[in-house]
Amino acid sequence: MDDIYKAAVEQLTEEQKNEFKAAFDIFVLGAEDGCISTKELGKVMRMLGQNPTPEELQEMIDEVDEDGSGTVDFDQFLVMMVRCMKDDSKGKTEEELSDLFRMFDKNADGYIDLEELKIMLQATGETITEDDIEELMKDGNKNNDGRIDYDEFLQFMKGVE
């Protein structure tokens, strides 16, 4: 598994991991190897509020199912959920945006600094340059203090819609 994805998975809250584990376990019941089939994966992700297209789902599966077993273990599933969570914020409630802010704010200091932003953006799997990351920070950091607070984050995310 790519280190960038591992870093992003580490930023998930225990609550998020527990929610993902509960959904995963529903589909793994009766499976001796503790894995779910790739066919069941779309159902699990939809149950968790994600709605990947069949193409996106296949792309994610291809990335994590390196041995071609047709199954995904929980660690691989977490990586897929992190990738899927990168979707834009259209229609997101303030509660969902608050959860997203906390996911970015790895050290829980109430701010997103450049390094936290970089880790999360790289975890999306998209090609992104240092200049792109710095530009996003500049766009989100309205008071020019070098970090994005919650209000700036909300304002920025509302502008993305």
From Swiss-Prot:
Q: Name it.
A: Troponin C, slow skeletal and cardiac muscles
**Which residue intervals define the domain EF-hand in the entry?**
16-51, 52-87, 92-127, 128-161
Q: Which UniProt keywords apply?
A: Acetylation, Calcium, Metal-binding, Muscle protein, Repeat
UniProt entry tagged with the keyword Metal-binding: yes
Q: Which family does it belong to?
A: Belongs to the troponin C family.
> Which residues does Ca(2+) 3 bind?
N143, D145, R147, E152
Q: Name one GO molecular function term.
A: calcium ion binding
GO cellular component, alphabetical, reads: myosin II complex
Binding annotation for Ca(2+) 2: D105, N107, D109, Y111, E116
